[in-house]
Each structure stands twice: as C-alpha cells, then as structure tokens.
C-alpha cells in the first residue's frame, strides 16, 4: 500500500511542507523563530477567541467586561494574561526573526521577504487595534494620539481621521470597529503566513553560511520537528513565567483606570514593541515629517535587497558588516528606551541622534561596508 501522506491531496501538502521537506543540515537556533511565530499566532487566536466570548465592545461596558473576565470567568485571568503577554512574545520573536533575516541575507528571497514585511505591518495593526479594547486610559489616549497622525496628511487628513473614528473623536463607533478589525486580522495574518511559506518553499531555506545548501539536505522530520518542539517548549515556558509571575510588568499602570476623555495621562506611550517607531516619530518636530519617518522606519525593510552590495550573502564571514549590524541592534534598543521616556532633554537629543543613526546605518554605512569587504577580499597581486 502506498503511503497515504504521499497520495492524499491534503496530506500531500502537509507532507511536502513539514515532513519530507528537504532542509539545510546546518540551520541554527535562529531558524526556530518562524515556527515560534506560528505557535504564537495559534496561541493568540485561541486565547482571543475565548476572550471574545465574554468581551463587550461598548464604551460603557468594555472596561468592566475585562474585569469580569479576570474575576468571574473560569481561568479568565489566565486567558487574559496569556493573550496580553503572548503579544509581547509574538513581537520578540518577530524582531529576532527579522534580525536573523538581515544578518544572514535572507532578504534576497525577495517574495518571501516582501510578504514578511506585509505580515509585520499587519501584526502591528492588529496589536494596535487590540490595545484599544480594554478601554483603559492608555488605550484611549494611545489611540487618540496615533490615529490623530492621519490628520497630518495634506488635504484629506482630517476627513480620513474622522472616517476611521466614525465621529469627531475616539468613541463608541471607534471601539466597535476596532474590535471587528482585531477579530478579522489574525485570520488574514494566517493566510499571509501560508503565502510566506509558499514562497519560501519555492526556493528552500537559507542557511548561516549563505551558500547554496542543495548538496547537503536532510528531511524536516524528525530533525527539525524535534528542534521546533524544543523551541516551542522554551517559548511556552517563558510565556507562562511572564503570565503567571508578573503579568502586568510589560503593561502600563494607566490602563487600570477606565478611559476618561477629560483627563490626559502625564506620559502617553504605546506598548514596548512600538516604542522604537514612536521614538523616531517624536524625534522630528514637524507632524507630517514625523509620520513619514515613522512609515519609513518600517518600509525601509522593503528596499533591503536593493541595498545589498556584498559578494557574500551572509554576514557570517563579514566582520565589518557584523559590527554595524550589532550597532543597529543597540541603536534599536536605545530607541525603545527613549520612546518610553518623557519629551525633555537629554531624551530629545538622544532620540534624534539614534533616529539619524538608524537610517544612516541601513541606507549608507551597511552598503558601504559591503563594498569595502568586496574590495578587501580581492587579490592585491
């Protein structure tokens, strides 16, 4: 009898994607984050589904419905904490996954990379609309500040902002539609993730050396299934430690107060995973300029393949590029820290310098480093 997994139309797809898939023999732990992101997405959809059963998207009852989930629903506190901290784990994995792609030159798989950038934007949109739902002070004011940025767009800005709000300010209509968006977007993310994998499987995985691995492939199962299982166990361990021991450490204390349009919190700031972009936005004194810089900070990833000047794909054997890469990582951590600080000196100047360095590194210094390394590798005799 021929093996069912190789003949059945549905099983065949699963088989070619997760079982008999030829994979490079040398991919490191940095290649675990793709599967971890898949795990995060499933955790978020499941916990979100159970939260949606008890949540009400109305300005009068949203805050108390979240309190009701935590107090009266069986394990509601756990479901909510897993969902809130699951978002942080999701972004942690996302940033490491993108960092891996930059370090090892995975962006040269252009279709996979571009779908990945679209995925990043979709996940950011989902997290943003989700943060509004508990209807706490930071939910309300964070949404007000960020959606207000649309009004910086010339001519159509104000109309656009009011269209998104469903009125003249963030209110009941905004909350209801954001709940609808927050419910539908994860399924769009799931579909995009499948397209992401489809494009990846057209070329096969990259590997740490950046050299074509076709001559030395191993089956995905059991080697990488067990490796992914280990990664998922560690992810779950960290998530449970967060959710059970310090569930509120990554949140904002202001969000324990119900939304009040008449009282502005002293420091309006988004969740930690948006702080780097928020710092770039704030570093430009002009509203429209800030919005453009904010967009550029993410969309710059799309031109990454065009900025690749090195003859080698990976940074594994390129010490100059490696140094710049880790400076970029440190710069992003600096931006994240600055984004959470009040708008005063010395944070303003640090934020402006870090923002300049971010664009300088990606657009000029890293391409120059690639050219320099090419020159250094040329025989000089």
Swiss-Prot record:
Membrane topology annotation: Multi-pass membrane protein
Domain of life: Eukaryota
Keywords assigned by UniProt, alphabetized: Electron transport, Heme, Iron, Membrane, Metal-binding, Mitochondrion, Mitochondrion inner membrane, Respiratory chain, Transmembrane, Transmembrane helix, Transport, Ubiquinone
Keyword hit for Electron transport: yes
Chain positions recorded as heme b b562 binding sites: 83, 182
Pfam families on file: Cytochrom_B_C, Cytochrome_B
GO terms of molecular function: metal ion binding; ubiquinol-cytochrome-c reductase activity
One GO location term (cellular component): mitochondrial inner membrane
Binding site for heme b b566: 97, 196
Gene3D superfamilies, A to Z: Cytochrome Bc1 Complex, Chain C (1.20.810.10)
Location of the protein in the cell: Mitochondrion inner membrane
PROSITE patterns with a match to the protein in the record: CYTB_CTER (PS51003), CYTB_NTER (PS51002)
Family: Belongs to the cytochrome b family.
Described function: Component of the ubiquinol-cytochrome c reductase complex (complex III or cytochrome b-c1 complex) that is part of the mitochondrial respiratory chain. The b-c1 complex mediates electron transfer from ubiquinol to cytochrome c. Contributes to the generation of a proton gradient across the mitochondrial membrane that is then used for ATP synthesis.
Further remark: Heme 1 (or BL or b562) is low-potential and absorbs at about 562 nm, and heme 2 (or BH or b566) is high-potential and absorbs at about 566 nm.
Annotated protein name in UniProt: Cytochrome b
Organism name: Murexia naso (Long-nosed marsupial mouse)
Taxonomic lineage: Eukaryota, Metazoa, Chordata, Craniata, Vertebrata
Primary gene name: MT-CYB
